[in-house]
A protein has these predicted regions:
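Short, well-structured secondary-structure segments
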Residues: 21-24, 38, 42, 59-63, ...
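Substrate-binding clefts and substrate-entry loops adjacent to catalytic sites
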Residues: 138-153
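C-terminal active-site subregion of NodB/CE4 polysaccharide deacetylases
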Residues: 7-84, 90-91, 149-253
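Acidic (Asp/Glu)-rich catalytic clusters
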Residues: 97-105, 122-139, 193, 211
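Short histidine/acidic/glycine/proline-rich micro-motifs that form metal-
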Residues: 113-117, 146, 180-183
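Short, glycine/acidic-enriched loop or turn micro-motifs at the edges of active sites
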Residues: 89-90, 143
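Alpha-helical scaffolding within the catalytic cores
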Residues: 67-69, 92-97, 115-133, 160-161, ...
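Hydrophobic H-region at the start of alpha-helical membrane spans
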Residues: 1-3
Length: 253
């Protein structure tokens, strides 16, 4: 174990990554649904993770800021990080947002449009308020169905109608997408481009650079921690190592 830790430390020192992490959260609450526990981070753990990021010099950015910088239309901080939330749970508004605001941090919420207003999920008013307070809203389809198994017509409905519904209800132009269950391929990525999306996030572990295909951005999944900040740091380290060794890398051609 000591030899492994020494090797990892040497790799990170010898080959510093040029990328940055995108964190993947779902629920931030003390009282999750019984079936949702693996996807829940208690508020105190979430706050500690945010404090760790700040102490390490990370600064939060939005997906749109990343897209603009990738096209030479802006600059990123020295250590950027994007904090994302999938599904659109109401605790993203009641629990996560205040903790982000206390630290001057931003986030991205990927919404399943047919869940909006249902018990435990964000309402339209909450979404619009989050947007006004610096949270970027992205799309997570209409029904949270894995896209690869759907017909072309169903894929188009899930990708396009959900985007239009968000924009019709007062959400600024939606540029970013999250694949339900990480279900994606080149054909779906092309559909997203044709539908005027600029970025899409997967469930693959890794860091991202301007060379990463923006339709296959990698993330660091953050489930309910069992070992506190140690586990959080190790998950970021794992993504870092995946990038160093070229695992799960989707590069532009």
């Amino acid at each position: 174990m000591l030899l492994l830790m020494a090797f990892v430390a040497w790799v990170l020192t010898a080959v510093p990554p040029e990328g940055f992490p995108i964190l993947e959260y779902h629920m931030v609450t003390e009282n999750p649904r019984p079936d949702a526990k693996p996807y829940v981070v208690p508020p105190e753990d979430f706050a500690a993770q945010l404090d760790y990021l700040k102490a390490e010099g990370y600064e939060t950015i939005t997906m749109l800021e990343f897209s603009k910088a990738a096209k030479g239309k802006g600059n990123l901080p020295e250590k950027p990080v994007i904090v994302t939330f999938d599904d659109g749970y109401e605790d993203n508004y009641t629990q996560a947002l205040p903790l982000l605001e206390e630290r001057g941090m931003k986030g991205e919420v990927y919404v399943v449009t047919n869940f909006i207003g249902k018990k435990g999920y964000l309402t339209w008013d909450e979404l619009r308020d989050m947007q006004q307070r610096g949270i970027e809203i992205g799309c997570h389809t209409a029904d949270h169905l894995p896209l690869v198994g759907l017909s072309r017509a169903e894929q188009e409905d899930q990708v396009r109608l959900s985007k239009l519904l968000l924009e019709w209800n007062g959400i600024k132009t939606v540029f970013s997408f999250s694949y339900p269950n990480g279900s994606c391929n080149a054909e779906i990525a092309a559909l997203l481009r044709d539908s005027n999306y600029l970025t899409a996030v997967t469930g693959d572990a890794g860091f991202n650079t301007f060379q990463t295909d923006p339709m296959f951005l990698q993330r660091v999944n953050i489930p309910r921690p069992r070992f506190g900040l140690t586990e959080f740091r190790l998950r970021i380290l794992k993504a870092e190592l995946f990038s160093i060794f070229g695992i799960n890398q989707h590069l532009q051609h």
